[in-house]
């Protein structure tokens, strides 16, 4: 009797949690409020760190700009969009943000694009 009560109670909890899940729609429809919009990023398997692609990102009706000296990848948005997720690319050019642009610093490292949900 106690076991069946626990199973029923567990099912009700799961049902209640699923019922409260909210679909936020597409990224374009989501209101990020004061936190800004997500930047496209690339990762590095050796350091397990991500860096933004470029330093300026369209956000709503304007643009969000990263702080100067932020490390970044000097990769065009079109190139980023065509990258295959989880494939390692060699010699991804590195730079630092300066006035909304990723300025090359003559260094490069291997990089990869995350899965689509990790944009």
Swiss-Prot record:
It comes from the Eukaryota. InterPro entries: EVA_Class_A. Residues 1-21 form the signal peptide. The keyword Cell inner membrane does not apply. Its main location: secreted. Keywords: Disulfide bond, Glycoprotein, Secreted, Signal. The keyword Flavoprotein does not apply. It is found in: Secreted. Disulfide bonds join 37-59, 55-97, 72-102, 92-111. GO terms for cellular component: extracellular region. Glycans are attached at residues 48, 67. GO terms for molecular function: C-C chemokine binding. Salivary chemokine-binding protein which binds to host chemokines CCL2, CCL3 and CCL8. This is Evasin P983. The lineage of its organism: Eukaryota, Metazoa, Ecdysozoa, Arthropoda, Chelicerata.
